[in-house]
Regions:
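A short, N-terminal "cap"/entry segment at the start of jelly-roll beta-barrel domains
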Residues: 1-39, 52-53, 119-125
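General detector of folded, globular domains
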Residues: 37-38, 64, 71, 83, ...
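Ligand-binding loop in jelly-roll beta-barrel domains
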Residues: 84-85, 93-119
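Short proline/glycine- and basic residue-enriched helix-capping loop/turn segments at helix->loop/beta transitions
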Residues: 44
Length: 125
């Protein structure tokens, strides 16, 4: 794909199976859309839902809380950090983490950078 500006419809984006409970995770910007240096997933966590445990061996990750409240759990240290609308979180490469929504649910935008190709196994390009 040539370098260009793209407008990507997240509504019709493919899903990746990283949500445990109510919700979904849609891949919006990833190597399958031509992105080489960045990824974005829209993660919708319903009431008291969570992601599976995540870890990116060669990628940092950053997320922005679009809506709702919850926490990010650092599996390595056992610490939980509260998150709310407008909050951001940065996770170093190799750190294991999990997002947990409160009763209000939580929507996030973000992902690993550079891409963690293992997240996209089985997706159509």
């Amino acid at each position: 794909m040539s370098e260009s500006i793209q407008v990507i419809d997240s509504v019709h984006s493919q899903e990746i199976p990283i949500v445990d409970g109510i919700g979904n995770a849609k891949v919006v910007v990833w190597p399958g859309t031509g992105a080489r240096h960045r990824t974005f997933q829209v993660i919708n966590l319903g009431e008291n839902s969570k992601t599976v445990q995540l870890c990116h061996p060669e990628s940092d990750a950053a997320y922005y809380v679009l809506k709702g409240q919850g926490s990010v759990f650092d599996i390595g240290t056992g610490q939980s950090h509260d998150l709310g609308e407008g909050g951001m979180v940065h996770i170093d490469a190799k750190d294991r983490y999990q997002f947990v929504a409160s009763a209000s649910g939580m929507d996030l935008l973000g992902g690993p950078c550079p891409a963690d190709i293992s997240l996209y196994a089985g997706l159509k390009t």
